[in-house]
Amino acid sequence: MNVLTIKGVSIGEGMPKIIIPLMGKTEKQILNEAEAVKLLNPDIVEWRVDVFEKANDREAVTKLISKLRKSLEDKLFLFTFRTHKEGGSMEMDESSYLALLESAIQTKDIDLIDIELFSGDANVKALVSLAEENNVYVVMSNHDFEKTPVKDEIISRLRKMQDLGAHIPKMAVMPNDTGDLLTLLDATYTMKTIYADRPIITMSMAATGLISRLSGEVFGSACTFGAGEEASAPGQIPVSELRSVLDILHKNTRG
């Protein structure tokens, strides 16, 4: 698995990189949250645009991207609009979703962008090309809030993301029992050791899946999400607790 280094942050080696989401609804809340989150020193700050009250207004979104870029300084900035069908806060038709991502990429003020795998292969490929032209890295994602697919299906989706040009494939699943957690961890380890030629992010959600958010360095997930002001998905824990566990594992599990 190759390491991806963006602005000096090496994704795919050492401790999993910590991503903190911004979950504010208003511009003021989001900018205040960005200032607070910076103090927690994440590796990557994610703006969850689907929570923003003006997410349908592309001009408002691009203006806020510019303000966030100034606030975050050189911190890595991930732009994510999570669609409703994949657990997001806002309904948006596909053409509007694609246009929003295009606008975000063309600001050149973001470092990474989330593109959902099931947005149509041609659409995804076009967005990946646009991202690469603008020096934006692609986190390609899929989320199952109902269940954990079988191991081969998880691997198949992650491999498809690689084939479509993802710089970082990402998969999040919901466990119904601890066996599902083991399925996700097994799929992650197999993907990392056999198929992945780039960093991947995986997680099993909710309380049952918590160990997957902590054990990325062991099984092969390159980043993990911690809660800043507010969690963006079930199972996220506060960043200070997350970092201390990652640190313990990093110091004590290396051969």
Curated annotation (Swiss-Prot):
MF terms in GO: 3-dehydroquinate dehydratase activity
Top EC class, one word: lyase
Coiled coil (UniProt feature): none
GO terms classed as biological process: 3,4-dihydroxybenzoate biosynthetic process; amino acid biosynthetic process; aromatic amino acid family biosynthetic process; chorismate biosynthetic process
Pfam families tied to this protein: DHquinase_I (PF01487)
Nucleotide-binding as UniProt keyword: no
Active site: residue positions: 143 (proton donor/acceptor), 170 (schiff-base intermediate with substrate)
EC number, UniProt record: 4.2.1.10
Function: Involved in the third step of the chorismate pathway, which leads to the biosynthesis of aromatic amino acids. Catalyzes the cis-dehydration of 3-dehydroquinate (DHQ) and introduces the first double bond of the aromatic ring to yield 3-dehydroshikimate.
Record text on subunit structure and interactions: Homodimer.
Protein name (Swiss-Prot/TrEMBL): 3-dehydroquinate dehydratase
Organism: Bacillus subtilis (strain 168)
Origin organism lineage: Bacteria, Bacillati, Bacillota, Bacilli, Bacillales
Originating gene: aroD
